[in-house]
Amino acid sequence: MKTLKNDWKLGAAVGTALSLGSAGAIAGPHGFDLHNVFHGASASFAGTSIAHVEDPVSAVFGNPATLTTYYGGTNFMFGATFYMPRATMKHDGSAGHAVANTGGAFTTMNETAQGSAAASFNFDATSKADVYAVPTVAVTQDLSGLGIPVVLGVGVSATSGIGVDYKHSSNSLGAAAELINLGVNAGIGMKMSDTMDVGISMTITYAMLEAGLTGSGGMTHDLGFRGTLGVRNKISDATTVALYYQTEQEHQYDNLHVTSMHGTQPFAALSSYSAAHGKTGSVVCNADVVTSNTGVCRQDVEVEQPWNVGLGISHNMDANTLVMLDITHKAWSDSKFFKEFYDDQNVISVGIQKTMGNLKLRAGYGYADDPLLSMVKVGDEIKTIGLVNSEGNATSSPMYGLFMSYFQAMETPVIYKHRVAVGLGVESFLGVPFLSLDTHAAIQLEEDKCFGSGQADYGTGLGAYSATTKGIALAGGLASDGCTSADHTKATVSSFHLGGALTWSF
């Protein structure tokens, strides 16, 4: 991602305030959900863990049916992964131009624009959100000794996250946003027969969202809940198949987003914004002292993580060789807010493990669809935005296709397609028979994407307010950067992570 003047301000404010942060932090092949890609041994398998697990954290936060792996005693795991993303964004100035130079026509400003050329709002920057520590803690306990034939698992870890930091750029207006979802999981797994296991778990997330843009946003937190059901069946001595389902997870961030800097009816005087689109209507306004044209309005923002369904297979090729395959479907199109930017996503991952004495050599690969919609429409969950532009003027604007497209570009870390991972497991670590070590290192290969040209066919018949604001470049485009003259933004992302964990088995 990058920084920009007004441009960024507008798009980013929308993004940060609204979106659980925005691009750059803990993102990967599952959008910004983690799905065991940072956890214990599963991180070595690119997250592959639906049918078989090699560590307690992956059982607690993955398919709860795999908790039955830990019948017999107590297992405690403690570790961390350090994630290092790199996100850069180049923008031609379209968004900043739209916020600064269209007052009275498409946006509301109390001051006359300085008339800066559209291209003067361009930027090319690298996010400073470049290192994250992800904790992994879990314990499993066999309750058979109490006459209860189940395994209980509890744990704490980050379940999703994303973020950007462009405060170092003078054109960013202090743009920075961060979302961290810290999950507390509790689950039980039970053997139903010699071949079938079932499990159920509950996730309670403490979500923290900070939107650090001038005039728009702050830090808000919320609690969310998600349930997971899982089953696995051993179809032969060597092969196990498994299935799990996760519900949606909802968070509501109270008074997070600024909808207007100019009261409840900020667009009544705009010459290029029609009554049919809300020119004379009132914006959402959580405020106690406002009039139709003065005062700052805010709104609550409701965001849903998608429901997921996953299928996994594990197979022991011989006594020392294990291979695994996972397929996960993420229903972004049913998720409030994110359905405006994402389509459904499919993720495939494979893992292999070779045991050599007390050593376990591991490798994994993951591939994911790019979930970003090729065309976005005007904002629905967030219909308007209020901010302070790069010239210091309070601005209010409808969420045009241009701003939605710009915000989508801020989420670019979700376009990762390829993850490659390796790892090492050591049983009886340091000669201690009840202690094991899991380590991993992984990269997400560089991807880039251009934004703007996909909006070319977004006409008034599809809901666009005007040809000017539908989302194509207004400041020359990025044809010289491998995009087209209709693209306003190009984003490039890559990442690396490594980590380790110790497990005590009693």
Describe the residue ranges of each PLM region.
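Gram-negative bacterial Sec-dependent N-terminal signal peptides
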Residues: 1-27
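Solvent-exposed, charged interface segments at domain starts and junctions
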Residues: 2-4, 8, 58-61, 178
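Hydrophobic alpha-helical segments and their boundary regions
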Residues: 4-6, 13, 36, 52, ...
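Surface-exposed charge patches in extracellular/virion surface proteins
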Residues: 4-6, 101, 109-114, 277-279, ...
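Short stretches within intrinsically disordered, low-complexity N-terminal or propeptide regions
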Residues: 14-15, 19, 100-102, 107, ...
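N-terminal, post-signal peptide beta-strand-biased segments of exported outer-membrane/organellar beta-barrel
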Residues: 22-146, 369
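Outer-membrane beta-barrel porins/channels
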Residues: 28-38, 42-46, 50, 134, ...
